Amino acid sequence: FGRFFTGQMTAAGKVPPAKVLVIGAGVAGLSAIGAARGLGAVVRAFDTRPAVREQVSSMGAEFLEVKLEEDGSGEGGYAREMSPAFIAAEMALFEAQAREVDIIITTALIPGKPAPLLITEKTVDLMRPGSVIVDLAAEAGGNCALTQPGAVINHKGVTIIGYVDMPSRLAPTASALYGNNLVHLLADMGGAKSWHIDEGDEVVRGALILLNGTLM
């Protein structure tokens, strides 16, 4: 992105802050909101789960909605597939936002399925030259129709980033956070002294694949 994130007032004129749209307000989306806000951007966010509105607002971002009530909350904090009417409404919202924002960051994933298509080629064409799309769902096929997994491309002046190795690009930090999660998981399971598998624990149950030879 070839401009300031934060707005600037200079003797030569005023530079407005960058406008960022984050699609999907899960862990990655909320992190993206925090990073963009920290750099001084104006941030908007969309998620099919109304429950995350408060989290988005608490981080200083505007929570966008469509005029169609439908809850996209799925299991494990992920979103579920939405109805055709809702998808059409959100597509119209993204097209309207594409005309205004400078950066779109997509993070939408559905467990066990390809990433939902949210940004069409038409939507990309509505963005100004110099704009950027960061597709964090590229490894699962991508939320943008033009994403090429593992590559960075330029489409009519719009840069589309489809990296599939984001954790590897920040290996020390990613490893430290992953290790920290494992330590807490094993401690919650009793540690070395009182190790046990509690099938009633939602976190443990979600991590189980086989138990006593039975596929969970």
Where do the PLM segments sit?
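Glycine-rich phosphate/diphosphate-binding loop of Rossmann-like nucleotide-binding domains
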Residues: 4-97
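Structural motif
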Residues: 19-21, 41-44, 62, 102-104, ...
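Short, solvent-exposed amphipathic alpha-helical segments in soluble enzyme
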Residues: 37-39, 59-61, 120-126, 149-152, ...
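A structured beta-alpha segment of the ubiquitous adenosine-cofactor-binding alpha/beta core
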Residues: 73-122, 163
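ADP-ribose/adenylate-binding Rossmann-like module
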Residues: 103-163
